[in-house]
């Protein structure tokens, strides 16, 4: 593959990684701005499921921080493999929660996130425009 095509593919990977990072970051920031409101909303959403309230509450306080950290790492391209793994695990937890709620529309959206985390993980060798690459 010629250098120009390789650079174009690496740039496309960067844009996808950056977009996922911004998405995760803004989700985290939005929830952290009113964490108690998010906590109460989550408790209400899971009130008819088998999950105990303390577990829902604990999750609602942890998820925004996880989203924020994963987002920052993806934006910077720092510890990208680990950030992608954590992001995929977070999405798995969210899919589980959506399944318990029988919220198939939200689960469909989360499955799309899962596919993007897979693509970014599978094609990690294209992660040229990143702090990880500068650290090599």
Where do the language-model regions lie?
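Extended, low-polarity transmembrane helix blocks
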Residues: 1-37, 53-65, 69, 76-136
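Perimembrane loop-to-helix junctions flanking transmembrane segments
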Residues: 39-55
């Amino acid at each position: 593959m010629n250098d120009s095509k390789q650079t174009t593919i690496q740039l496309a990977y960067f844009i996808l990684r950056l977009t996922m990072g911004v998405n995760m970051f803004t989700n985290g920031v939005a929830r952290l701005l009113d964490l108690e409101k998010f906590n109460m909303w989550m408790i209400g959403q899971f009130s008819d499921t088998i999950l105990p309230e303390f577990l829902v509450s604990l999750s609602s306080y942890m998820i925004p921080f996880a989203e924020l950290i994963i987002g920052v790492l993806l934006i910077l391209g720092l510890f990208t493999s680990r950030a992608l793994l954590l992001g995929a695990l977070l999405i798995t937890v969210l899919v589980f929660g959506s399944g318990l709620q029988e919220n198939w529309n939200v689960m469909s959206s989360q499955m799309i996130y899962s596919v993007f985390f897979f693509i970014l993980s599978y094609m990690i060798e294209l992660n040229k425009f990143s702090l990880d690459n500068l650290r090599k």
